[in-house]
Amino acid sequence: MKKEQLKDFDNLAQSLFYEMFGDPAENEKGWEVKKLGDISSIGTGSTPNRKNKDFYKNGTYPWVKSTEVCNLPIYSVEEYITEEALKNSNCTLYPPNTILMAMYGQGKTRGQIGLLKIEACTNQAVAAIMPTKEVVDEIFLSQHLMLMYEHIRNMARGGNQANLNLSIVKSIQIFLPPLSLQRLFAQRIEQIEREKSEVQKSIQDLETLLASRMQYWFE
């Protein structure tokens, strides 16, 4: 039951966006439209040489792969790189509130969005989008991009496995309601996320309790 509630929170966020701003694909409310590259700074990263163990052993800089970009806030990562790797590769350390977009990857990965909650680098399969704060709110923009998932995937180019690239990402059309309205939306989303986190914690607590009781009864 509680896991179903998590989906309800996601649906609520989407419904709130549609209610306040309309469909990003239709822009029936006639908001001003600009290219993503005109309202943000967009970069990417790289994969430090895997053969050099000094680039990964005891790494301290979070390094995000496209498979970890899955329409959720990013608080932690699977791998870390060292300062030496950062200095000797095309990796860039991006600040919290950078929006990440998976440009290619297996299955449904391409086009998915993540909002960095930590300072982190990325590999070359991820676009890092830093919104111009005077124009667009990062929470509004991340939700906008998530709702354009199918449209963005269809913009990909290539043969057997179509990919996005930075030029395509920069060309994505974004509508821009007044910043005050974007920020009001962001405040409501933050409240939804707080409530969602509470439900997630209660699920984790319940699973921990059940595991301990199973261990008690069967060992």
Short names for language-model regions:
Residues 4, 8-46, 171-183, 190-219:
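Non-catalytic DNA-recognition/assembly elements of restriction-modification systems
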Residues 29-32, 49-56, 156-158:
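Short coil/turn segments at secondary-structure boundaries
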Residues 37-52, 67-96, 122:
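Sequence-specific dsDNA recognition surfaces
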Residues 53-54, 116-117, 132, 160-164, ...:
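Short proline/glycine-enriched turn/loop segments at secondary-structure junctions
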Residues 65-66, 82-146, 165:
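A short beta-sheet element
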Residues 119-127, 158-183:
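A short glycine-rich beta-alpha junction/loop motif
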Residues 145-149, 153:
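Short amphipathic alpha-helical signal-transduction/dimerization elements
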